[in-house]
Swiss-Prot record:
<feature type="transmembrane region" description="Helical">
    <location>
        <begin position="262"/>
        <end position="282"/>
    </location>
</feature>
<dbReference type="InterPro" id="IPR029044">
    <property type="entry name" value="Nucleotide-diphossugar_trans"/>
</dbReference>
<keyword id="KW-0328">Glycosyltransferase</keyword>
<dbReference type="InterPro" id="IPR050256">
    <property type="entry name" value="Glycosyltransferase_2"/>
</dbReference>
<feature type="transmembrane region" description="Helical">
    <location>
        <begin position="227"/>
        <end position="247"/>
    </location>
</feature>
<dbReference type="GO" id="GO:0005886">
    <property type="term" value="C:plasma membrane"/>
</dbReference>
<comment type="function">
    <text>May play only a redundant role in maintaining cell wall viability and bacterial virulence.</text>
</comment>
<dbReference type="InterPro" id="IPR001173">
    <property type="entry name" value="Glyco_trans_2-like"/>
</dbReference>
<dbReference type="GO" id="GO:0016757">
    <property type="term" value="F:glycosyltransferase activity"/>
</dbReference>
<keyword id="KW-1133">Transmembrane helix</keyword>
<dbReference type="Pfam" id="PF00535">
    <property type="entry name" value="Glycos_transf_2"/>
</dbReference>
<keyword id="KW-0808">Transferase</keyword>
<comment type="similarity">
    <text>Belongs to the glycosyltransferase 2 family.</text>
</comment>
<protein>
    <recommendedName>
        <fullName>Putative glycosyltransferases</fullName>
        <ecNumber>2.4.-.-</ecNumber>
    </recommendedName>
</protein>
<keyword id="KW-0812">Transmembrane</keyword>
<keyword id="KW-0472">Membrane</keyword>
<keyword id="KW-1003">Cell membrane</keyword>
Length: 342
């Protein structure tokens, strides 16, 4: 059985070497056939140099250097596209998610027969103010996205090769990987994880809002349907009000001047109109970007052996006798991998 560990690097210089040490130790408990893939997402620090230095002592390390910063999600998809393992362990390199999670994730995947075991916050770190934004994000996603996103999911996950191959078939240029994880399907099992928190994050409030907008507009047409019904409701209400005013003016009394109400109505309808046009513009811009068919990342260089022509064997072949016995993992000898084009 071959195991791939995939991680991305951005401002990761303080963590690369320790991440490698922990990841390698966790992988060696499962199989000797390992590859560790670092994807440099245009990191401005020395993370790339540290990762490349590992090649001198471990030929299982591969480093994919992107030509610039493309974003966390696109970097992850690039790493997954180059993974050749029968199982693929995706995890962030900042050590907030411990690489030692690989072993319990592996045991749960084997015991449940799942295609994916993904981490979820057992309890979100930080106070209520820090967690208020994520709660609103997931509530909005549950209301507007189809399918709804699983709440409090983490990057860390263990996946079969069949699932990864299906996942990387998605070719959206504007990636929202949380939605892709969901719509790819397969049998997915959550697992509670106590995630550490180093006190800072590269996901600013602006990035979180942008992520929410991407999630909603990439996987749902509900906002457009909402606009349709909103417009219909405004038309019905305004038509009814106009009819009432005309009848009132003709049969009952003179129409009183109401400049304040007129101005408020104009501003309100103007704001709704601008909002709706902007929302439609987001959808149109996504169509525009997709029609260009640009690659979602560009690789500048790959350090280490390129094994992308090596195809993983099926999970059934990789685990002919793997099972849990009395809570302990029992595995057979790893089998050879099939070869062919991937």
């Amino acid at each position: 059985m071959r195991l791939s560990i995939v991680t991305t690097m951005y401002m990761s210089e303080p963590y690369v070497l320790e991440f490698y040490r922990r990841a390698r130790a966790a992988a060696d408990k499962i199989t000797p056939d390992v590859e560790i893939i670092f994807v440099d997402d245009g990191s401005p620090d020395a993370a790339l140099q540290q990762a490349v230095s590992l090649l001198d002592s471990d030929p299982c390390v591969r480093v994919i250097q992107l030509s610039r910063n493309f974003g966390h999600h696109k970097a992850m998809m690039t790493g997954l596209a180059h993974a050749t393992g029968d199982l693929v362990f995706l995890i962030d390199s900042d050590l907030e998610e411990d690489p030692a999670l690989l072993e319990p994730f592996y045991e749960k995947l084997i015991s449940t027969g799942a295609d994916v075991v993904f981490g979820c916050h057992a309890r979100r770190p930080g106070g209520w103010l820090r967690n208020f934004g994520p709660k609103i994000h997931y509530r909005a996603s549950a209301l507007l996205c189809d399918p709804p996103l699983h709440e409090n999911t983490l990057t860390v996950r263990l996946m079969t090769a069949d699932y990864v191959r299906s996942l990387v078939q998605h070719q959206e240029r504007e990636l929202s990987i949380a939605g892709l994880w969901q719509i790819t399907g397969f049998y997915q099992v959550p697992m509670s994880v106590n995630k550490a928190w180093k006190g800072t994050t590269t996901y600013t409030f602006r990035r979180k809002v942008a992520t929410l907008v991407d999630n909603v507009t990439s996987f749902s047409n509900k906002p457009l349907v909402f606009i349709f019904y909103l417009g219909a409701a405004i038309f019905i209400i305004s038509s009814s009000a106009a009819g009432y005013l005309i009848i009132d003016r003709i049969f009952f009394r003179a129409l009183q001047a109401g400049w304040a109400s007129v101005i408020v109505s104009i501003w309100m309808l103007g704001g709704v109109t601008i909002f709706c046009i902007g929302l439609v513009g987001i959808y149109v811009s996504k169509v525009f970007i997709e029609t260009k068919q640009r690659p979602y990342t560009i690789i500048r260089r790959i350090y280490g052996s390129d094994l992308t022509t090596r195809e993983p064997s099926s999970l059934k072949t990789a685990f002919p006798a793997a099972h849990l016995s009395n809570g302990k993992r029992v595995t057979s000898e790893p089998e050879g991998l099939a070869t062919g084009n991937r």
